[in-house]
């Protein structure tokens, strides 16, 4: 994105944003590169402008824009100006190639401007701006029109929220915006000179800046809005724009659900091997496991342990979709089974947060056997010991997890807009040669069909679980 200032007599408070378009209340100053380039062409440009009429300032220069919106203002490189003596000049500049030209022979440009404005209707082309009825009558309206176009363009084309346009007090947002714009101004030197359309150039470079700073933002899967990652966790990974429930890591879910200082993990040292010596042309299975362990800091796709939820002791397993898509291998099945057996022995309520793509194909039939093993342990926990199990289905919950412990709860809870299915839409359509309707695998649609009991947003989830446990005679330890 080219970083530059356009100073003009728009009589409006200066503002700066990612497009770096600002307006000065004092003068039509030099059009310059914000990176303070030492290019001699730029220096010559400043001198040429300052030589007009022998003045050092431009408070008496009137600036005309024959435009209907800001898109034309930005894309048009030719401007029509009138100095204090009534002489009219045309300015042409090309920031990419450092070209600046001044011409006072402009009959076609001037006549085109008069034809497209109400100036012709007034029948006045006075050389003296003090007696020009067009200037006196319409200057305020024209300035407001340009300002309105600028505000509209910034909001619609550059996706800047209205509170940013009006000047936000959020210093962190301003700092981020200025940092991004500062970097983009330097990186603009590498833009392709063959790209002539500034709107296209702006859009492509804006995308590059977004990609460059993607470690600062989380993009919503629903509305594609950007959420600042620093505050994203405190908002429970909910989109600030549309409220969509985005994916959470297992560690964040544990922090959300379990009381601080009460989490005790189980079987952390259990890791996967390569039981069937699965070989892939892309990457060996063992190398993939090592890669995900380094990436996520986890040993497997599930964390299990015990903790307190509003003072109530619970056993909880949380699957992590970031680790190989939350796929269920032999280690995942073994850790969940051991947790269920521990909860059975200690008479603890059980929570399993599901986020999985299904059984792990790299372990073959061993991964499929985990479905039966976990279901068998749950049968003893629920039917024989009469204990309380709550699965929480998050997005996505598919495959073998849906076909086993995901749907065996006493009370089944789903998150809003969660993707819940046995087979994915693409697999069904290719296998059955039938079209799967959009939304037919969403939590809201499946709730109407009776697949689970509750759809609970993240904000009240902990209190809902606490009430369910107390309803089933599980009470806080410190309660009298």
Swiss-Prot record:
A zinc finger (C4-type) spans 220-242. It comes from Helianthus annuus (Common sunflower). Its EC number is 2.1.3.15. Component of the acetyl coenzyme A carboxylase (ACC) complex. Biotin carboxylase (BC) catalyzes the carboxylation of biotin on its carrier protein (BCCP) and then the CO(2) group is transferred by the transcarboxylase to acetyl-CoA to form malonyl-CoA. Disulfide bonds: none annotated. Keywords: ATP-binding, Chloroplast, Fatty acid biosynthesis, Fatty acid metabolism, Lipid biosynthesis, Lipid metabolism, Metal-binding, Nucleotide-binding, Plastid, Transferase, Zinc, Zinc-finger. This is Acetyl-coenzyme A carboxylase carboxyl transferase subunit beta, chloroplastic. GO terms for molecular function: acetyl-CoA carboxylase activity; ATP binding; carboxyl- or carbamoyltransferase activity; zinc ion binding. It holds the Pfam family Carboxyl_trans. The keyword Heme does not apply. Residues 25-48 are annotated as: Disordered. It is an enzyme of class 2 (transferase). One of its GO terms (cellular component) is chloroplast stroma. Its cofactor is Zn(2+). Zn(2+) binds at residues 220, 223, 239, 242. HAMAP family: AcetylCoA_CT_beta. InterPro entries: AcCoA_carboxyl_beta (IPR034733), Acetyl_CoA_COase_Trfase_b_su (IPR000438), ClpP/crotonase-like_dom_sf (IPR029045), COA_CT_N (IPR011762). Binds 1 zinc ion per subunit. It is found in: Plastid, Chloroplast stroma. Residues 35-47 have a biased composition (Basic and acidic residues). It catalyses: N(6)-carboxybiotinyl-L-lysyl-[protein] + acetyl-CoA = N(6)-biotinyl-L-lysyl-[protein] + malonyl-CoA. Acetyl-CoA carboxylase is a heterohexamer composed of biotin carboxyl carrier protein, biotin carboxylase and 2 subunits each of ACCase subunit alpha and ACCase plastid-coded subunit beta (accD). Residues 216-480 form the CoA carboxyltransferase N-terminal domain. NCBIfam families: accD. The keyword Lipid metabolism applies.
């Amino acid at each position: 994105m080219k970083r530059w200032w356009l100073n003009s007599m728009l009589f409006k408070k200066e503002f700066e944003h990612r497009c770096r378009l600002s307006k000065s209340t004092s003068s039509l100053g030099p059009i310059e590169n914000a990176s303070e380039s030492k290019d001699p062409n730029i220096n010559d440009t400043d001198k040429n402008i300052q030589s007009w009429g022998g003045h050092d300032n431009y408070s008496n220069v009137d600036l005309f824009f024959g435009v209907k919106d800001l898109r034309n203002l930005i894309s048009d490189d030719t401007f029509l100006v009138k100095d204090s003596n009534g002489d009219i000049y045309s300015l042409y500049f090309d920031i990419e190639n450092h070209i600046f030209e001044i011409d006072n022979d402009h009959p076609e440009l001037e006549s085109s401007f008069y034809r497209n404005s109400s100036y012709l209707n007034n029948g006045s082309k006075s050389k003296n701006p003090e007696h020009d009825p067009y200037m006196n009558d319409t200057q305020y309206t024209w300035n407001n029109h340009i300002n309105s176009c600028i505000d509209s363009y910034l909001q619609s084309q550059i996706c800047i929220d209205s509170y940013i346009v009006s000047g936000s007090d959020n210093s962190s947002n301003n700092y981020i915006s200025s940092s991004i714009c500062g970097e983009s101004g330097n990186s603009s030197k590498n833009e392709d000179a063959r790209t002539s359309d500034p709107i296209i150039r702006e859009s492509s470079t804006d995308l590059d800046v977004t990609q460059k700073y993607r470690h600062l933002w989380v993009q919503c899967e629903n509305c594609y809005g950007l959420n600042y990652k620093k505050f994203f966790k405190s908002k429970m990974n909910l989109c600030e724009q549309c409220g969509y429930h985005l994916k959470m890591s297992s560690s964040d879910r544990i922090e959300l659900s379990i009381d601080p200082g009460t989490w005790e993990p189980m079987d952390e040292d259990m890791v996967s091997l390569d039981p069937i010596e699965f070989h892939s042309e892309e990457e060996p299975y063992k190398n993939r496991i090592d890669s995900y362990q380094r990436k996520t800091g986890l040993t497997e796709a599930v964390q299990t342990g015990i903790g307190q939820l509003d003072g109530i002791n619970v056993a909880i397993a949380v699957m992590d979709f970031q680790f190989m898509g939350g796929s269920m291998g032999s280690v995942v099945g073994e850790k969940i089974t051991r947790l269920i057996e521990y909860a059975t022995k200690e008479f603890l309520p059980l929570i399993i947060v599901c986020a999985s793509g299904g059984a792990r194909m790299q372990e073959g039939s061993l991964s499929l056997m985990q479905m039966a093993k976990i279901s068998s342990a749950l049968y003893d926990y629920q039917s024989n010991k009469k204990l309380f199990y709550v699965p929480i289905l998050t997005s996505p919950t598919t495959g073998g997890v849906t076909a086993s412990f995901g749907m065996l709860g006493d009370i089944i809870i789903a998150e809003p807009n969660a993707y819940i299915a046995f087979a994915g839409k693409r697999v069904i359509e290719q296998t059955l040669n039938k079209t799967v309707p959009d939304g037919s695998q969403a939590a809201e649609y499946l709730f109407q069909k009776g697949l689970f009991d509750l759809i609970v947003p993240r904000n009240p989830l902990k209190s809902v679980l606490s009430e369910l446990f107390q309803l089933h005679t599980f009470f806080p330890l410190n309660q009298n």
